[in-house]
C-alpha cells in the first residue's frame, strides 16, 4: 500500500529541461484520474504561480483543479517545516514539487531528502548531459550523507528528444 501523500519532485540543476512543463502536465493528468493534488512552485521564476494568477484574472475565482503554493527554496528551515506539514496532511494524495534549476538553494536538501520520488528530466545535448550527470552525482552523495532518511526513488527521463 502506498502511503499518502506521495511527494514527487521534478529536479535538475539545468534549467530549460522541462521540469515545470512536466510537473503541470502530470498534475493535470492526476486530477483527471481523481487524485487530490497540490503543486508546490519552488522554482526561482515561480512560473506555475504566475500562470495560476493569470488564469484567475482571466477566468475568475472558480474552483481550480488543484492548489498551487509558491515557496522559496532558499530557506532550509522553512522547507523542512513545509515537508513535515505536507507529509502529515491527510487531505492531500499527491504533492508535485517544481524545484529550481540550480543547486544553490539550501532548501533543496530537505526537499530531496523528504521526497518519495525524484524525477530528473534532461535532453541530449553537450551542455545538459554533463550538467545532469553532475546533478545525479550530487543526489547520490546526498543519499550517502543522510543514509536511510532519504528513501526517494529516482527516475531519469529524456525529454525534448526527437
Briefly describe each language-model feature range.
Residues 21-22:
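Hydrophobic positions on the alpha1 helix immediately C-terminal to the Walker A/P-loop
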Residues 5:
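Short coil/loop residues immediately preceding or within conserved phosphate-binding loops
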Residues 8:
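Conserved beta-strand position immediately N-terminal to the Walker
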Residues 2, 11-13, 17, 28-102, ...:
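P-loop/Walker-type NTP enzyme "switch/lid" segment
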Amino acid at each position: 500500500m502506498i502511503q499518502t501523500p506521495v511527494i514527487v519532485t521534478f529536479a535538475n540543476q539545468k534549467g530549460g529541461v522541462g521540469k515545470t512543463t512536466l510537473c503541470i502536465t502530470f498534475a493535470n493528468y492526476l486530477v483527471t484520474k481523481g487524485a487530490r493534488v497540490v503543486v508546490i512552485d519552488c522554482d526561482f521564476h515561480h512560473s506555475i504561480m504566475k500562470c495560476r494568477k493569470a488564469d484567475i484574472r482571466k477566468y475568475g475565482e472558480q474552483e481550480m483543479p488543484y492548489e498551487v503554493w509558491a515557496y522559496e527554496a532558499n530557506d532550509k528551515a522553512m522547507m523542512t517545516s513545509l515537508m513535515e506539514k505536507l507529509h502529515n496532511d491527510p487531505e492531500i494524495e499527491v504533492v508535485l514539487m517544481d524545484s529550481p534549476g540550480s543547486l544553490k538553494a539550501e532548501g533543496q536538501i530537505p526537499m530531496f531528502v523528504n521526497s518519495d520520488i525524484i524525477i530528473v528530466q534532461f535532453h541530449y545535448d553537450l551542455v545538459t548531459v554533463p550538467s545532469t550527470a553532475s546533478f545525479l552525482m550530487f543526489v547520490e552523495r546526498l543519499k550517502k550523507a543522510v543514509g536511510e532518511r532519504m528513501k526517494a526513488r529516482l527516475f531519469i527521463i529524456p525529454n525534448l528528444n526527437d
